[in-house]
Amino acid sequence: MSSFLVAYDDESEEEDNNNNNNNNNNNNNNNIINNNNNNNNSNNQIKDEDNIYSYNNDTIISQSQVQPKTVTLGLNNKLNQKKIQQTQQIQEKDKLSSDFNFYNNNNNSNSNSNNDENDDFIYNSNNKKRNNIDNDAEEINEFRNPDLKNKPKSSHSLFSMLPTPKSSQNTTTTQQSSYSFPKPVNNNNNNNNNNNNNNNNNNNNNNNNNNNNNNNNNNSNNNDDEKDDDKSKKINENENTVNKKDNIENQNENQNEIENENENNNNEDTKKKINNSMIPGSLRKKLLKNQPKTKKSTTTTTTATTTTTTITSVKPITTEINNNNSNSNNLPSIPIGNEKSKINDNQDEEDENENDGLFFSFQQSSTNNKKPQQEEIDYSAYINNDDGDDDDDDDENENENDSQPEEEYEENKQQQQQEWTQEQIQQYWYMQQQEQQQQQQQQPFNLKSQQQYQHYHEYNNVGKIYEVNQSKMLEENNSFKILELRKTTQEQDRVLANIPKVSKSQRQKHTIGSLLGDYQTKKYKFE
């Protein structure tokens, strides 16, 4: 194999590189010039597009100046006109009022004014006011049915029933006479210029393509870097927003916990004052029921800390456990955080129940060394409280000792019921019967007294069985009335026995006079 050695000249390579760079620079300059020419041509084309003319009704209107027309049904124009007329009317009325006040002041100052001129001025001002009122009435009628003037030949117009378009509220009708019409422009010069520029552009397109390939490679690298930067910025922004939200939530939670603690402390103080006060049992229970309950504090964070501390106390598994046949790892029992919270809740409930039992406790608590401040409490709302809680009141009134709570009272009641036996019951009734017999022996029997009569009737009819009829029931129920009738008859007989003897004629006169007297008294009463 034959090897050939080739020697390169460094100077020839440098010259070739310089020539290539110069050519590239020249091409770039040409591209800039061509781009400027293209921009100028595009601007000229835009101006030409603006000056495209539409020939309608022998008039020339440029599209750039024409405003969009909207068809309105007569409401919008009349509403705008009405606003203008209202402002004019207000101005005219202000002028009239000012002139009238000025005229009155002149009358007070100048006593020698002519009455004829005054009458003329007042007449003219009244006519103006009447004309304004008539115009207002016409405008109202036009506003209600705006197509009165431009009404079609048909029996009724449906245009007034159509709703107004939303876009028509901000638009107004246009008139052709208000536009300034431009003059036409020769398009021949523009066409020649465009042809020359197009030729120059075609010559320079080849140079542009070569440069674009180099630029695309550079742009691709730059775009990748920019995308990475944008992603990192977005991630940082999202993290910042999340951190801000977390901080705000933590602040709100702390504030809520502080408020709940303050409320709970206040409620506990009031409960202690009520229990230590000399309030009766039924009213005291109502006060305690109507007070708000203690709010439980959220202990989510504390439970997590307790679990971490307990896990550290786990002992490693010894070899003795592995020697046994048990394959499972016998780990010690780990207490759960929720169990501690349950224990605390149960303790709080027990404390509340203990506080409920404190009736008339005058001893001060050991923790509070200070004397309790006595506050005035309005009991009117609780005394005249007709909330329909009658059942609770009845249950409370049944308790003989209001100072005892319900649980203790029920226990004592059950004990009393269990203590009574049949022998004790018989002794109790035997003693009562002896007392009644002693009373009967001491007191003589009188039919006039209702109690003795009923007792006598029951005592004599203890073991007897007899048929019950309606007549007997009525007699038994009306026994007291029968006794009263007997009293009256006996008294009348005694009175008649003591009265001196009188002839029949005198008796009749006496009865007639008494009847007339009764009639007159009744007559006056009704009148």
UniProtKB/Swiss-Prot annotation:
Basic and acidic residues bias (residue ranges): 141-150, 229-248
Basic residues composition bias: residue spans: 283-296
This protein's name: Putative uncharacterized protein DDB_G0289963
Domain of life: Eukaryota
Disordered: annotated segments: 1-49, 99-307, 319-353, 382-419
Cellular component, GO, one term: nucleus
Compositionally skewed regions (Low complexity) per UniProt: 18-44, 99-115, 167-178, 186-222, 297-307, 319-330
PANTHER family per UniProt: PROLINE-RICH PROTEIN PRCC (PTHR13621:SF2)
Biased composition (Acidic residues): 8-17, 386-410
